């Protein structure tokens, strides 16, 4: 597993990276993560998050545009454990998570807005692999996202940590 340091990536690739507004906190067991973007757009319904966690995710990060809702958690321990088991590098969630003590022990990167104890309704509503924009950055499927305790950045191409 590669350890990413977003300040070093910003210094090495200033013309490539976009910095996501600093509103996210680390809830996962990995201090840093990065990979190819897979997007989901959903609102208070994590059906697609659950479906994608069941898919192979090596080298990929699930970017979830939850509309910034602070009323429901889009990720909990069971989905996070499935995502980790299926090789996902992490998730960036414009929304909330729950079971935060378990998430902190799970081998998965998780950046989200806040904890919230209430689960979502599963109605099967949402869009997969669409362009999403939040926190002043546009996330496109197939581009790359990197995250650590300093922040979240996006690049159109993969970045290597400087020597």
Swiss-Prot record:
Binding site residues for substrate: 76-79, 98
Gene Ontology annotations of biological process type: regulation of RNA metabolic process
Function, in words: Catalyzes the aldol cleavage of 4-hydroxy-4-methyl-2-oxoglutarate (HMG) into 2 molecules of pyruvate. Also contains a secondary oxaloacetate (OAA) decarboxylase activity due to the common pyruvate enolate transition state formed following C-C bond cleavage in the retro-aldol and decarboxylation reactions.
Pfam families noted in UniProt: RraA-like
Transmembrane segments: none
Cofactor: a divalent metal cation
Residues the record lists as binding a divalent metal cation: 99
Protein name: Putative 4-hydroxy-4-methyl-2-oxoglutarate aldolase
Species this chain originates from: Pseudomonas fluorescens
